[in-house]
Structures are given as structure tokens and as C-alpha cells.
Amino acid sequence: MKLKTLLLLIDLGKRGAIGGKITITLREISKELDVSPQTTLRWLEELEELGYIEKEESRRGTSVMITEKGIRLLEKLYEDISIALYSGVIVGEVISGIGEGAYYVRQYAPFIREYLGFDPYPGTLNVKVIFPKTIFDALCTSRPIIIPGFKKNGRTFGDVRAYRIKIDGIEGAIVIPSRTVHPPKIAEVIAPVNLRKTLNLQDGDKVRIKVL
């Protein structure tokens, strides 16, 4: 199938042609896709011949519905695009934190050692996510390691979700506390070393994080 024909199928889905018929005109579709009405008609006929849509002509326009075969194609396309976009890679920009990372890493250090297998440097590297939209998009296919909460000196420390990562060859983890003040655009990274010093990072530097 040609890319333009596939784009037409996607456009029909966006217009609501899944689960029921919609009425369209060649003029509005051709304007959306920046092609002639004749080309739009030819693409509709191709989709119909391939079994991806059903269509009927009337005085009001063309009634179109995406078939089950067409829906399966769109679902497969969505899965492939999701894998391509959210393959566990985060591209971000180094930023300064609010200064609390060192304290909390020290409190959780014994549990980080137990559950992640390394002694963490007392501090976090904060990364503002550029791609994908949020850290959750990059982590959606990964299973977290749950570091359980605990009480210490009358204070309660909540659970932490940890995701193993590698940044410029150094293994570490993205940590997401159950009680976080950071928005989903900020990734907190811990590692056995001072990442800023080891990788010579400054605020504004771009980094690439691979989720393991």
C-alpha cells in the first residue's frame, strides 16, 4: 500500500469511520490531503479493493466505513509506531535539581544496594526530557523494580519505582518516588558515580539514556 493511501485511511479513522459510516465529500478530503478530488477518489477505490473500507455513493456524498481488516491494519501501524517512538530511549537536557536528591539517596542507599546491586553516589542527575514527551512514554514497556518504603526516625519514606538504565556506558537507574515533586518531564538518575563529574556534564548539555 502506498503511503498516501495509508494516510487517507488514517484520516478516515480520525473522522470517525471506525464502528460506523460517515459521509464525506471528495473536496474536503482532497483539501486535507492536498491532492485533487480525482486522486482522492482513486485512493478510496484502492482502499475498497484491498478490503480496508466499505463505501457507498449518494447525493449527499460518499458514505465510508473502515472494515475490520482496516482496523487491524491501523492497530498494527499504531503498535509499530509506538515501538519506534518509545523504544526505551530518552533524550534530555541536564538541569539543576532542588538540592534534596543527596538527602533522599542517602536514606534509600541500603535498599538501593539490596534491590539494584550498587552503592549510589549521594545525589541525582536531573534530566529534562526532550524526547519522548514524558519519562513514562519511554518507560511504558519496562517493568520497574519496586524499592519498598520504610520508616526512619519518625518519618515515612514511600515506595520508589526504579528502572535500570545506561547513560554513556555507565549503568544506573531512573528513580520515581511515590511522593515526587517533579513533573513527568523530569528524570532523576542515580548511579554508582557522580555522573556530572564523570561525564563532565553541565546544565544544558544533551544526554541520551537507554532503558535496559
From Swiss-Prot:
Tell me the residue numbers annotated for binding FMN.
180, 188
Keywords assigned by UniProt, alphabetized:
Flavoprotein, FMN, Kinase, Magnesium, Metal-binding, Nucleotide-binding, Transferase
Q: Which domain of life is it from?
A: Archaea
In this chain, the stretch annotated as H-T-H motif-like covers 1-87
Provide the catalytic activity annotation: riboflavin + CTP = CDP + FMN + H(+)
One example GO MF annotation: nucleotide binding
Which GO terms of type biological process are on file? FMN biosynthetic process; riboflavin biosynthetic process
Its cofactor is: Mg(2+)
Q: Among its keywords, does the record have Lipid metabolism?
A: no
Q: What is its EC number?
A: 2.7.1.161
List the residue ranges forming a coiled coil, or say none. Answer: none
Write out the pathway annotation from the protein's UniProt entry.
Cofactor biosynthesis; FMN biosynthesis; FMN from riboflavin (CTP route): step 1/1
What binding details are noted for the cofactor? Binds 1 Mg(2+) ion per subunit.
Q: Where does CDP bind?
A: 97-102, 193-196
Q: Does the keyword Acetylation apply?
A: no
Q: Where is this region: Riboflavin kinase?
A: 88-212
Q: Which residues take part in binding Mg(2+)?
A: 124, 126
Q: What does this protein do?
A: Catalyzes the CTP-dependent phosphorylation of riboflavin (vitamin B2) to form flavin mononucleotide (FMN).
Please give the family membership noted in the entry. Belongs to the archaeal riboflavin kinase family.
**This protein's name:** Riboflavin kinase
Q: Write down the species.
A: Pyrococcus horikoshii (strain ATCC 700860 / DSM 12428 / JCM 9974 / NBRC 100139 / OT-3)
Q: What is this organism's lineage?
A: Archaea, Methanobacteriati, Methanobacteriota, Thermococci, Thermococcales
